[in-house]
Amino acid sequence: MHKLYSLKKAKKILIATNNPGKFIELKEILPKKIKFYKPKDFNLKEPIESGKTFKANAKIKSSYAAKRTGLISISDDSGLEVDALNKKPGILSARWAGPTKNFNIAIKKIYNLLKKKNRLNSKARFVCAISVALSDGSTFEYQGKIEGSLSFPPKGKKGFGYDPIFVPKGYSKTFAQISKIEKNRISHRFKAFIQIKKFFKFS
């Protein structure tokens, strides 16, 4: 784990995502003194996510970005697992939103599938795998999750993706209804990232 100590002195980090919501969340979790870059700053195309797990896909994205930019690159692969749908959409969460990334389409699809099963309040969880890739090819993956249940109709406008239908365990509001500060404190993304902070004390 000693190689990741270089993160402590990192001045530039590429957040390898084209999802504005994910970029903002990761940026808010990371130290403020670092200059952050997006894939479009380097005209990077999205690599093909051929992995079978969240960790595998996160690694594909971070490795691709680090290799082509020479910067420490952080990527995440996350998704919603719905128990009543055998943990689908899972790693296909973004694809369910279609090429335009319209999550209203994905949410409607989940609603229709659950309605047929009479399981609209199915238990579910958000899973996030974060991968850190160094310019020497080393990668490190961490995973976090938050349990909860689904709620229809969608509620709230503060989140993105499936946030409007996900109620974290112990809460009565959806991710899209609670504040960014509160969401960042309990989110699957934060739980994955906090594992990096255990090893690397950002100053």
Which residue ranges define each predicted feature?
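Anionic-ligand binding patches
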Residues: H2-A16, P20-S203
